[in-house]
Amino acid sequence: MGTIICIGGLVGLKNKEKVFIPYSPRKIDFEIMKLSTKVNPKVLFIGTASSEREDYYISFKNAYESLGAIVENLCVLNNNITFEEIRKKILSSDIIYVGCGKTKFMMDVWKSKGIDKCLIEAYKKDIILAGMSAGSYCWFKYNYEMIEGLDLIHMINCVHYDEKSKEKKKQFYDNIKKNNLRGIAIDNDASLIFSGTDYKIVKNYENSKAYDIVFEDGKYIEKEII
């Protein structure tokens, strides 16, 4: 089975007007590229969750091209792309990176287009999967709001954890207990690299963290992943 990189978010990805701006690659980006054995890996960006915003794709493309990647964009909205074309693009990639945005919208589009099936197939073929925010949620069984993902990681995920309100953290904790599932919380500028049942943290800054949360023996146990 493949490798999945789940990113909690990136500070400074947008300006005050919510426009995606150029950014310099950070430690997590370098780590994603290192996971490929190729000098110039083919990286497929999937921006469904942001409604395929061009400014987001350009920002991502420039960052990853500076690392030597050959970057392509998967656009499925407002065009006549076929399932066969989608599948070919996905399975011919070395790395697939799913961007941030609206999780439920993204998952609904994926199911209608068959993208979900293609990504599961890519995982089985050891294609590297990565993503941020909604692009992290999609690999898990659920996100903290119980939006269903692809269940490649049989846990509940909460991203942007360092800026979540008490109410949203409570919702996350409640759903861990109700569903008897392990929870994974990831701060902005932190990521977890999953390989099978093992995972490790990679972070851009020392104060960015991730947590493993379970409900056992009538209480919650939250452990920082180090």
Regions found by a protein language model. Give the residues of each.
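Class I SAM-dependent methyltransferase SAM-binding "motif I" and its flanking Rossmann-like core
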Residues: 105-169
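Short, flexible loop segments at the rims of nucleotide/cofactor-binding pockets, characterized by
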Residues: 19-23, 72-77, 106-109, 161-162
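ATP/NTP phosphate-donor binding region
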Residues: 23-27, 31-89
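Structural motif
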Residues: 6, 95-99, 130-131, 157-158
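A general structural motif
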Residues: 1, 38-43, 93, 126
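Short glycine-rich anion-binding loops that position phosphate/pyrophosphate groups of nucleotides
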Residues: 10, 101-103, 135
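Flexible gly/pro-rich beta->alpha loop and the following alpha-helix that scaffold active-site loops
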Residues: 76-128
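C-terminal and late-domain segments of enzyme folds
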Residues: 1-39, 48, 54-58, 145-226
